[in-house]
Amino acid sequence: MSVVSLPQLLEAGVHFGHKASRWNPKMRPYIFTERNGIHIIDLVQTARYLNEAYEYVRDAADRGWRFLFVGTKRQAAGIIAQEARRCGSYYVNQRWLGGMLTNWATIKTRIDRLKEIEEMESSGLLDRLPKQEASRLRRELARLEKYLGGIKTMRKLPDAVIIVDQRREANAVQECIKLNIPIISLLDTNCDPDLSDIFIPSNDDAIRAIKLIVGKLADAIYEGRHGQLDTVEEDEYDYEGAMDLDDDILEDMEDEEEGEAEEG
């Protein structure tokens, strides 16, 4: 029994890595082959590592651990918010603010400010202020909500952090390492497994791949807190036929490469 089937992984495009020229050699053990210049991730290993991650997260949630989901890229942002909310976790899906964990005391004061203005809004106080002052406070509220809304109920550091795109979220990774907070991450073929405590070899650009893996980790948290979820049986599937890149996955991968080029 597995938390996900190989057909599900294939259909979501989890097996498509980056261009072979952009790989991290440390990911060699998790690569099945190269096709048309693209590394193909070994999905048998993906399924195994996902099962292990699921058990780890489920058991940790059962012990009362609190999780922070991090994914600020376009393809991941909506999924991160949706899945974190579904399982009652925290999330950062816009910009990672420097010191978000390592300078938690300062971040917490900004969260307190967010709640203060929210209370002013809900109580009707903003409507009684001069128009210019009310407008300024509402702009401040929108800005704070955008960057801190996903952690405004977080009163202390998380027990573990789930990350989509290790390279993009390098600052979050380094803060977790500095504070000895366990990192659970999707690792594409350009990532470094040494920077994660628990990892799942997976495409981290395609929306469907992110949705599947992050959704399963959210399931694990939910199960740990609330009870059993169903696992899946393996079915017969045309694995070779599913190895071809489809247009949606290619578009997501190309968008990510263009974004990295602009940042560089």
Curated annotation (Swiss-Prot):
Which SUPFAM superfamilies would you find in this protein's record?
A: Ribosomal protein S2
Q: Which GO terms describe its molecular function?
A: structural constituent of ribosome
The GO biological-process annotations, alphabetized, read as: translation
- Please name the Gene3D superfamilies in this protein's record: Glucose-6-phosphate isomerase like protein, domain 1, Helix hairpin bin
Decide whether keyword Nucleotidyltransferase is in the record.
no
**Family annotation (Pfam families):** Ribosomal_S2 (PF00318)
List cystine links.
none
Q: So which domain of life are we looking at?
A: Bacteria
Q: Which GO terms describe its cellular component?
A: cytosolic small ribosomal subunit
The molecule here is called: Small ribosomal subunit protein uS2
Lineage of the native species?
Answer: Bacteria, Bacillati, Cyanobacteriota, Cyanophyceae, Synechococcales
